[in-house]
């Protein structure tokens, strides 16, 4: 980031908020491809005679690409000039792909610089490495959700109109040429589509340039949450003094505090309708959860607020059925691969007063997380480890590997799943997953050696797999002191790790 600031100050771009000239800097494209500055021009898929700079990145090539983007149908030339023009035959999407890769780096600079400057002003840089873990959310839910009454499971709506995204970025990027280029990339790259949707064209866009796609999606979510947070803090009895909720940690790791929000004159008259001192909000993937200790009427008001926000501010229709209001403890929801609920658990205590004894039974809610075995089996079946009934099958694609590589792959998958699901309140489902993976591994090895599973296991012994399928309690016994907790009690308690920064690929197969 200091390197970025040096380039900006040297070129005089920082004071004027100009980002467009950075598109012509060679180091931007080196960073986009995660390579050094002395990489040859093959990164641009062009020969050196076109780039004009031999074995270095060419700003001349970038200028030519941008010029051809602005000139409609400029890539169509006559056959007579094809020998002199090396650009003939390129698809127009090639130009957008090359420019958008550098554009994704450039548009992140204002956000990153403001984040660094805000941290320096506070002079307190907290170590948030542990907060980046996915498991860091669950202790928060355990502490808060057990005292709440209602929860709303909200599906963040789409599509997002492309012009709305440009207007959102306009509050941060005060560079008109950059915004014009962004509009051109949007409308031409999407072949006339005016919105980002989860269809095939949007998938291709996210596949070609996932960095820019995630940046645009995060910008849209920041706008939604900033307005919601403004209303929540303005209506709350216990107003917070800082704004620091966690973002999706992709290329920028915080939110800015100063958000410009336009309010109408009678806005304060309606704030009392939303006063709730116990409102909690958590977002994950394309969904969010809003829980409250208030009444059902209050949750319906928040639901109406979200629907009107998406329709009036973002200009697209949002169906009220996207927001489901449910009451604890009669509700379970999928959250990051876990089936979460807040059941009421009874506990009894015997009390004696004089000659009379009493049995006191108390009911306390407790946040629980469990593994939903049916979606997990479906995920394993999709990955070709078993069929839809949960019966293990061989993995023919891995039969050409060595025995140690096959066992290592199966063992690594199980250890990763066991590590991710260590927070489950009931770990019996892990034994079912272990059974499927172990037998699938044995059948893959038997298929490779043209033998039966029974004969293969009798020849090598069941201890052959123990080294590769080390259970979580065995790992804990090596890490924790023997006198800290009983091992059987520790294996039943949820354990949250602070080193998990991504969801397991098999968990991603769930229809969340």
UniProtKB/Swiss-Prot annotation:
GO terms for biological process: mRNA processing; RNA splicing; tRNA processing. GO terms for cellular component: chloroplast. It comes from the Eukaryota. It is found in: Plastid, Chloroplast. Pfam families: Intron_maturas2, MatK_N. Keywords: Chloroplast, mRNA processing, Plastid, RNA-binding, tRNA processing. InterPro entries: Domain_X, Maturase_MatK, Maturase_MatK_N. GO terms for molecular function: RNA binding. Belongs to the intron maturase 2 family. MatK subfamily. HAMAP family: MatK (MF_01390). Usually encoded in the trnK tRNA gene intron. Probably assists in splicing its own and other chloroplast group II introns. This is Maturase K.
């Amino acid at each position: 980031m200091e390197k970025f600031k040096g380039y900006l100050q040297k070129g005089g771009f920082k004071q004027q908020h100009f980002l467009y000239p950075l598109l012509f800097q060679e180091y931007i494209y080196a960073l986009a491809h995660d390579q050094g500055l002395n990489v040859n021009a093959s990164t641009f898929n062009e020969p050196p005679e076109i780039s004009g700079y031999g074995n270095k990145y060419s700003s001349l090539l970038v200028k030519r690409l941008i010029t051809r983007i602005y000139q409609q149908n400029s890539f169509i030339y006559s056959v007579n000039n094809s020998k002199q023009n090396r650009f003939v035959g390129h698809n127009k999407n090639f130009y957008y792909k090359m420019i958008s890769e550098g554009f994704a780096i450039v548009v992140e600079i204002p956000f990153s610089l403001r984040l660094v400057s805000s941290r320096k002003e506070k002079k307190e840089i907290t170590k948030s490495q542990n907060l980046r873990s996915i498991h860091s959310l669950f202790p928060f839910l355990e502490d808060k959700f057990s005292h709440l009454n209602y929860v709303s499971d909200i599906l963040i709506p789409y599509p997002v109109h492309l012009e709305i995204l440009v207007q959102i970025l306009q509050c941060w990027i005060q560079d008109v040429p950059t915004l014009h280029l962004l509009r051109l990339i949007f409308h031409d790259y999407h072949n006339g589509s005016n919105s980002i949707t989860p269809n095939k064209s949007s998938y291709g866009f996210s596949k070609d340039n996932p960095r820019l796609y995630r940046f645009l999606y995060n910008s849209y979510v920041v706008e939604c949450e900033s307005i919601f947070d403004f209303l929540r803090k303005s209506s709350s009895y216990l107003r917070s003094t800082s704004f620091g909720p966690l973002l999706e940690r992709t290329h920028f790791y915080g939110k800015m505090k100063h958000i410009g929000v336009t309010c109408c004159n009678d806005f304060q008259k309606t704030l009392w309708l939303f006063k709730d001192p116990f409102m909690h909000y958590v977002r994950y993937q394309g969904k969010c959860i809003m829980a409250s200790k208030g009444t059902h009427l209050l949750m319906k008001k928040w639901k109406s607020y979200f629907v009107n926000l998406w329709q009036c501010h973002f200009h697209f229709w949002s169906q009220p059925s996207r927001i489901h209001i449910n009451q604890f403890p009669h509700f379970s929801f999928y959250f990051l691969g876990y089936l979460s609920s807040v059941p009421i658990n009874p506990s009894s205590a015997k009390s004696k007063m004089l000659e009379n004894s009493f049995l006191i039974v108390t009911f306390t809610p407790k946040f629980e997380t469990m593994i939903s075995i049916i979606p997990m089996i479906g995920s394993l079946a999709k990955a070709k480890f078993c069929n839809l009934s949960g019966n293990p099958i061989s993995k023919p694609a891995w039969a050409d590997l060595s025995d140690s590589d096959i066992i290592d792959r199966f063992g690594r998958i199980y250890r990763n799943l066991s590590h991710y699901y260590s927070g489950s309140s009931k770990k019996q489902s892990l034994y079912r997953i272990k059974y499927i993976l172990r037998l699938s591994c044995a059948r893959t090895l038997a298929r490779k050696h043209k033998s039966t599973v029974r004969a293969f296991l009798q020849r090598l012994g069941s201890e052959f797999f123990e080294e590769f399928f080390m259970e979580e309690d065995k790992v804990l016994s090596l890490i924790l002191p023997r006198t800290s907790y009983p091992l059987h009690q520790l294996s039943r308690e949820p354990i949250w790790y602070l080193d998990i920064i991504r969801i397991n690929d098999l968990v991603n197969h769930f229809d969340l």
